[in-house]
Amino acid sequence: MSLSRRSSLRLLAAAAGTAALAPLVACQPGGRRAGRTGPWRLGVLQYLQVPAVEVTREGVLQGLAQNGFRPGQNLQVLLRQADGSPARCRRLAQELVAADIDLLVAIGTPALLAAIGAAPGSLPIVFCYCANPWGAGAGGSATEHRANVTGTVTTTAVGELLRVAQLLVPNLQQVGLLYNPAEPNSSFEAELLAQAVAQRQLQLVREVVTDLADLPEAFQLLQRQGVQALIKVEDYVTLEGFDQLAALALQARLPLLAEEPDDAGVLGCLAMVGWRSIQDGQRAGELASQVLRGTAPASLPMQPPGDPGLWLNRDTARRLGIPLPASLLTQAQAVLG
């Protein structure tokens, strides 16, 4: 785990210091539910259907299969899709809990929030694709969390993104951010970014987007304020509208840095720092396997799926006229284009 990653986790813990924790009761959840025979029953609650989330879910199933839990053999998967609706997500969480499942996998912070709200303390929950589990009520730190909850934490490595941005734009002074403050992930990461920007004596310019239709106007507002680079954090609006955002950035010759591996291959995205979605899901699948075999979630720290990697887009760099520094080329996990 990098220094910036550890710093993010400390900030997360502090931000959720007032959250109520479920007690670590004597009856720790884990393993098969009482009296159950036949295939294990796995509930999967997915907040949004976009490629990165779909790949994460596939990774979960791969992680389970690699540890002996295979759909169609000894594992029954009950998948529910919330289509980006918090109300629907809550209803589906209740539906899965009523289906007498052995374990609930929550994909996305809103899905985790709904799962925690619906599940009794005896039902294990494993989460992934989640930037802010503390804000969803999972616990106060990586090791002090609800007895029935564990999972993977993918808080954007904002410090590393800024370091990369400063190498790509040497005279960087102003950084732009488009975000939806109504989203817990987005508002939380916006504050992390603001702190990281201040530490580097830079300026952060924010504009709000609550819908895809807001993107062009909000982008133009950032442009008019003279931002020299745009940072994308966890946000469902910019996630869904990333192709549009990348096209706007390319047209404006504005460097765009993101946190989703799928973003890195989009023309207009210059760099990405983050985790592969398949890697995130696989690690969550491994955690789910441990829980199904009887390990108490309380004993499994909430954890990142590994160290974040760097992806660079050479085609975007050429179009922007930005040379890729040798130090970044050496560090990069992938150079596309």
What are these regions (language model features)?
Residues 2-337:
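Short hydrophobic alpha-helices and adjacent helix-cap/hinge residues
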